[in-house]
């Protein structure tokens, strides 16, 4: 980071990496003051035909994400070591800090209103023409995965809809 920019908005862990690597930089917001604890900045999106034709494949991805969350909660350091350099192009130290500020939480059902509210904000800022359609957020497959894997779900520490 050579100082050629005045401001940056970025996801974790890269936001923290910018902060660490540029002397004199400061955080204006980390999202918590805007959105509150437990907000999501990432979602799993799938086209309707995929959901209709291959729901088991989507459910397998959801279960894998829940399994990864559990692995992260049970042994954070090992999980981060597995992903640093391969998935996240940053230092282990930056990744640890990012994980502590925005931990993995797959069950985002209590954030439904948050998603719709953000689409209204995006429309007001001119980024999108239409707000999120009411049927765009569908928790059916997540709820099926939870029901089919109650033991796994029960072990998760972070859940927005317990």
Which stretches of residues belong to each language-model region?
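Pocket-lining segment of extracytoplasmic ligand-binding domains
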Residues: 1-86
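Intrinsic-disorder/low-complexity, polar/charged segments
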Residues: 8-9, 108, 138
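Short loop/turn and capping residues at structural boundaries
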Residues: 11, 29, 96, 133-134
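Short secondary-structure boundary/hinge segments and terminal tails
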Residues: 17-18, 36-38, 101-103, 138-144
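Generic low-complexity, intrinsically disordered sequence content enriched
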Residues: 20, 81-84, 99, 145-146, ...
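Short, structured secondary-structure boundary patches
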Residues: 29-33, 48-51, 113-117, 146-156
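Secondary-structure end/capping motifs
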Residues: 52-131
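Conserved C-terminal helix/tail region of periplasmic/extracytoplasmic solute-binding proteins
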Residues: 123-162
């Amino acid at each position: 980071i050579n100082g050629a920019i005045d401001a940056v908005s970025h996801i974790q862990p890269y936001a923290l990496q910018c902060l660490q690597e540029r002397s004199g930089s400061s955080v204006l917001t980390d999202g918590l003051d805007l959105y509150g604890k437990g907000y999501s900045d990432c979602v799993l999106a799938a086209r309707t035909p995929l959901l209709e034709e291959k729901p088991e494949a989507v459910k397998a991805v959801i279960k894998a994400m829940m399994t990864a969350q559990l692995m992260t909660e049970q042994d954070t350091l090992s999980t981060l070591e597995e992903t640093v350099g391969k998935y996240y192009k940053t230092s282990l130290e930056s990744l640890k800090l990012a994980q502590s500020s925005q931990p993995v939480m797959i069950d985002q059902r209590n954030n439904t209103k948050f998603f719709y509210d953000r689409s209204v904000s995006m429309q007001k800022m001119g980024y999108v023409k239409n707000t999120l359609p009411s049927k765009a957020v569908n928790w059916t497959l997540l709820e099926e995965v939870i029901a089919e894997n109650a033991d796994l779900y029960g072990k998760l520490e972070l859940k927005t809809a317990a």
